[in-house]
Curated annotation (Swiss-Prot):
Gene3D superfamilies: 3.30.70.240, Elongation factor 4, C-terminal domain, Elongation Factor G (Translational Gtpase), domain 3, P-loop containing nucleotide triphosphate hydrolases, Translation factors. The gene is lepA. Belongs to the TRAFAC class translation factor GTPase superfamily. Classic translation factor GTPase family. LepA subfamily. PROSITE patterns: G_TR_1, G_TR_2. It is a peripheral membrane protein. GO terms for molecular function: GTP binding; GTPase activity; guanosine tetraphosphate binding; ribosome binding; translation elongation factor activity. It comes from Francisella philomiragia subsp. philomiragia (strain ATCC 25017 / CCUG 19701 / FSC 153 / O#319-036). It comes from the Bacteria. It is an enzyme of class 3 (hydrolase). This is Elongation factor 4. GTP binds at D14, H15, G16, K17, S18, T19, N131, K132, I133, D134.
Length: 594
């Protein structure tokens, strides 16, 4: 056991985490030359295209160190984006050390700081590594100072490397061997294994990635899942080298996979503990906290025949993604679908993209909302995660909205413009510090403002250099109202949203104008209105198409013309009473997309 090293890499998007892991695999001969490709561990297409890591992956490598001993390195790749921080905390629960990889040209970013604190809270040894030293703009000394000032860990002798060219990669491996502590645990104790991740394989059933804390798990043995109490028999155990490599057993301190023919998707929940059926341990491994979804949106299939497939797809994804929440929902405008909960907007986009790609579904997503708390006049408090659940304005005493504390790191030149957007988004400044060449700004912002488009705005005003990390801190009373859209007097549930009273008129007007462009003209007038409770705040009309009924008159008497026009008017009036407006799907899509 003293030769096992479990570690993961913490790094901001694009700081070279996946490339560095490729080099580790090459140095330790994990794959033959032929099988090496860029970003071996980013196995999903979306991960490659967007250049981000979404899922945690694990690799076991044998490294012959300079002292002549062979070490087993278990390396768990983690995502860098703020929406996937729960993936990070999960990976860290299985490790004893973490490499903090920082781009020597760019310096420290906000999300790296957040993930680094998670690692320190879990008592991991954090080792700073400066990457990309082959770049002409690299300033290792300045960045080392930044690491010390912002994060507060000693970076004086930080190992430098360039993952792209391969310089210094062996030094990094030596640093891991020297500084990461060996795992603790007893091979002969009762079995305790933590499930770090699970995914569904069409041939094998559920495949789980586990970290054995105590004891040994052999092929053919029976084990049980502690939360459900159900027992299974181990069909295969082994490690990823990154290919699946079968072994006879996994022992304390190791990280590997198990396949036990579990067909039920919820059979091995992530964060659960496995133990032997015949000799169980009494206490589970302390896992990690279950993440609460922060953003909710309705998802609907464009054709209703896809609904059963949609349900199955969500089931399979939720196995692989512990933080996805969903429940059935019915909308008059969009039919059957699910109300889904996500960690943030990127998470929502990724899930939608995975559903469309991996399961061939065509989806519409309603406008995202966060969870409000409505206090009714009779004292009851209800959680509101969709506009339709908001009680009537007369019944509400007050509405509380979630407030997040946002830490923003930006270069000095952009401070002014960042403060401006924070104020526009109803933010309250908490703190502002100059750290090295960067400025750390802390604001309390309403969560709905952060999840809608704050990140994009921040990136554009800081030319891509700003970075953001946020966490929910409290609920605060706010003047929120429900903005309804009425078409010919009928409410369209899919377009309702919860907005701040000050912005309601402006938002309503904008929405109505956009819909006017998108709804095709009918044979009768279509009135589009935005309303708050019983008050109409904006209105627009799609003019009717009319046939020229006088075309056949040629001169003729004025009373004849009047008669024809009156008759047409009557017809239009009757049509308006009984006619219903078909709203094309595109109209919903473009209004919801913004």
């Amino acid at each position: 056991m003293k030769n096992i090293r479990n570690f993961s890499i913490i790094a901001h998007i694009d700081h070279g985490k996946s490339t560095l892991s490729d080099r580790f695999i090459q140095v330790c001969n994990g794959l033959s030359e032929r099988e090496m490709k860029e970003q071996v561990l980013d196995s999903m297409d979306i991960e490659r295209e967007r250049g981000i890591t979404i899922k945690a992956q694990s690799v076991t490598l044998d490294y012959v160190a300079r002292d002549g001993q062979t070490y087993q390195l278990n390396f768990i790749d983690t995502p860098g984006h703020v929406d996937f921080s729960y993936e990070v905390s999960r990976s860290l629960a299985a490790c004893e050390g973490a490499l903090l990889v920082v781009d020597a040209a760019q310096g420290v970013e906000a999300q790296t700081v957040a993930n680094c604190y998670t690692a320190i809270e879990q008592n991991l040894e954090v080792i700073p590594i400066l990457n990309k030293i082959d770049l002409p703009s690299a300033e290792p000394d300045r960045v080392a100072e930044e690491i010390e000032e912002i994060i507060g860990i000693d970076a004086t002798g930080a190992t430098t490397c360039s993952a792209k060219t391969g310089i210094g990669v062996e030094d990094v491996l030596e640093t891991i061997v020297a500084k990461v502590p060996a795992p603790e645990g007893d091979v002969n104790a009762k079995l305790q294994a933590l499930i770090i991740d699970s995914w569904f394989d069409n041939y094998l059933g559920v495949v789980s990635l586990v970290r054995i804390k105590n004891g040994t798990l052999k092929k053919g043995e029976k084990f049980k899942v502690m939360s459900t109490g159900v027992s299974y028999q181990v069909d295969r155990v082994g490690v990823f080298t990154p290919k699946m490599k079968d072994l006879d057993h996994l022992k304390a301190g190791e990280v590997g996979f198990i396949v036990a023919g579990i067909k039920d998707i919820h059979g091995a929940p992530v964060g659960d503990t496995l133990t032997h059926t015949h000799n169980p341990t009494d206490k589970p491994v302390p896992g990690f906290k279950k993440v609460q979804p922060q953003v909710y949106a309705g998802m609907f299939t464009i054709s209703s025949d896809d609904y059963p497939d949609f349900r199955e797809a969500l089931d399979k994804l939720s196995l692989n993604d512990a933080s996805l929440f969903f429940e059935p929902e019915v909308s008059q405008a969009l039919g059957f679908g699910f109300r889904c909960g996500f960690l943030g907007m990127l998470h929502m986009e990724i899930i939608q993209e995975r559903l469309e790609r991996e399961y061939n579904l065509d989806l519409i997503t309603s406008a995202p909302t966060v969870v409000y708390k409505a206090v009714k006049k009779d004292g009851e408090t209800i959680d509101v995660d969709s506009p339709s659940k908001l009680p009537e304005p007369g019944a509400i005493a007050e509405i509380h909205e979630p407030i997040v504390r946002a830490n923003i790191l930006v270069p000095k030149d952009y401070v002014g413009s960042v403060i401006t957007i924070c104020v526009e988004k109803r933010g309250v400044q908490v703190d502002l510090n100059y750290v090295g060449s960067q400025v750390s700004i802390t604001y309390d912002l309403p969560m709905i403002e952060v999840v809608s488009d704050f990140f994009d705005t921040l990136k554009s005003v800081t030319k891509g250099y700003g970075s953001l990390d946020y966490e929910l801190i409290r609920y605060e009373a706010a003047d929120m109202v429900r903005l309804d859209v009425l078409i010919n007097g009928d409410k369209v549930d899919a377009l309702a949203s919860i907005v701040h009273k000050d912005q309601a008129k402006y938002k309503g007007r904008e929405l109505v104008e956009r819909l006017k462009e998108l709804i095709p003209r009918q044979m009768f007038e279509v009135a589009i209105q935005a309303a708050i409770g019983g008050t109409i705040v904006a209105r627009s009309t799609v003019k009717a198409l009319r046939k020229n009924v006088l075309a056949k008159c040629y001169g003729g008497d004025v009373s004849r013309k009047k008669k024809l026009l009156e008759k047409q008017k009557e017809g239009k009036k009757r049509m308006k009473n009984i006619g219903s407006v078909e709203i094309p799907q595109e109209a919903f899509l473009s209004v919801l997309k913004k």
